[in-house]
Amino acid sequence: MRVAIETYGCTTNQADSDIMRGFLSGEFELSSVEDAEVVIINSCGVIDFTERKIIRRMLDLKREGKKVVLAGCLTRISKEALSVADSALSPDNLDMVVDAVYSALNGRKLFTERRFIDKAEFSHLKCRLRENAIAIVSISEGCLGKCSFCATKFARGRLRSFSMDAIVREAERAVRAGYREIQLTSQDTGAYGMDKGRAMLPELLRKISEIEGEFRVRVGMMNPQHAVRMLDELINAYSSEKIYKFLHIPVQSGDNRILEDMKRNHTVEDYVEVVEAFRNSFDDVLISTDIIVGFPTETEEAFWKSYELIKETRPDIVNITRYSARKGTPAARLRDIPGWIKKERSRKLTDLMRKIGLENNKRFVGKKLRVLVTKEGKNGRNLARMNSYRAVVTEGAVGEFVEVKIKDCRFNYLIGQLAAEQPQ
């Protein structure tokens, strides 16, 4: 029996797919989607557009005669997606994936009951695709927030932090196996440990930094309200050369009233304090943030506050999302803003983000830098990362640290040439 997994969404889903492949490999032949008889769709439910896309994909696969197992967040968010699937497997039932496949073949059954499983304890089973030098390591499931626009909470639930020792062991195994970039992922890395009584992310980073070998760690998204409360300890942990000086800190709006409506539990000032502290502590920090445009209560004045915040704090990456109502969330009960207004606000913010990104990157042109090559690209050019996680397109073998000279840049990446190839 041939089984394939198709993954959508965040790095947490990618890590979940690695675990499922491990369980499946002992029972089935893992194949491409084209050759598979059963396809597991590991779904994302962040926005309505993605949900519709996934449902269409499931219907297409069924028309081809394939059985479809729905996994991921839509198992708890979308009744329509569940109705299309031949079986379903929620994120806290990954160890039952073999049963879910047999259920799709022999009689529909849903594996969606609420359970707590420490996914770090399954890490030794992971079957990663050796496409690059990156290993994704989950550190927790769920979050402490109650954002009024977010449906992911329905799928992932309250925060459950995984065993620190098991996480460190997984990172150590990955480094020994040749992976050079460890990506720590969760719905909110800054909340790690808080369900156990204290903030434990800095301690986790210190322990991973002590692993022997040359590698880098990318810390995933953390919310401002957690980062600001452990700022000194967090910056101290980031001082290790093994930790990318990369900070993904979503502000979502530049207006505190909108943040209250979103139930974000932080202020604009919290975000600014964290960004300024990191920039004052390190020579080069890559700041990434998220903005939702067109939230139902966002006025024109509120939007321009978001615009001015981005203009003033100059993040390198701004993930811009046009608000879309998710069924069952408090925000879905509010009157929506017309689509053309959302589109126009998104365009203005995108133009600003591209301008700032280009200006931020120009200062590196002409410099020689040591980078880690992490992914294969096209036409002999691969993706590498600076110590700040800034993207560099260059030559070099995946998994190797190389010296490059930056020749040019775009708003979202630098273009480098191997220093050894520079004309004398």
Curated annotation (Swiss-Prot):
InterPro entries: Elp3/MiaA/NifB-like_rSAM (IPR006638), Methylthiotransferase (IPR005839), Methylthiotransferase_CS (IPR020612), Methylthiotransferase_N (IPR013848), Methylthiotransferase_N_sf (IPR038135), MiaB-like_arc_euk (IPR006466), rSAM (IPR007197), rSAM_horseshoe (IPR023404). It catalyses: N(6)-L-threonylcarbamoyladenosine(37) in tRNA + (sulfur carrier)-SH + AH2 + 2 S-adenosyl-L-methionine = 2-methylsulfanyl-N(6)-L-threonylcarbamoyladenosine(37) in tRNA + (sulfur carrier)-H + 5'-deoxyadenosine + L-methionine + A + S-adenosyl-L-homocysteine + 2 H(+). It comes from the Archaea. Its EC number is 2.8.4.5. The keyword Calcium does not apply. [4Fe-4S] cluster 2 binds at C143, C147, C150. Residues 1-106 form the MTTase N-terminal domain. One of its GO terms (molecular function) is tRNA (N(6)-L-threonylcarbamoyladenosine(37)-C(2))-methylthiotransferase. Keywords: 4Fe-4S, Iron, Iron-sulfur, Metal-binding, S-adenosyl-L-methionine, Transferase, tRNA processing. Residues 129-359 form the Radical SAM core domain. Coiled coil: none annotated. Its cofactor is [4Fe-4S] cluster. Belongs to the methylthiotransferase family. CDKAL1 subfamily. Catalyzes the methylthiolation of N6-threonylcarbamoyladenosine (t(6)A), leading to the formation of 2-methylthio-N6-threonylcarbamoyladenosine (ms(2)t(6)A) at position 37 in tRNAs that read codons beginning with adenine. This is Probable threonylcarbamoyladenosine tRNA methylthiotransferase. It comes from Archaeoglobus fulgidus (strain ATCC 49558 / DSM 4304 / JCM 9628 / NBRC 100126 / VC-16).
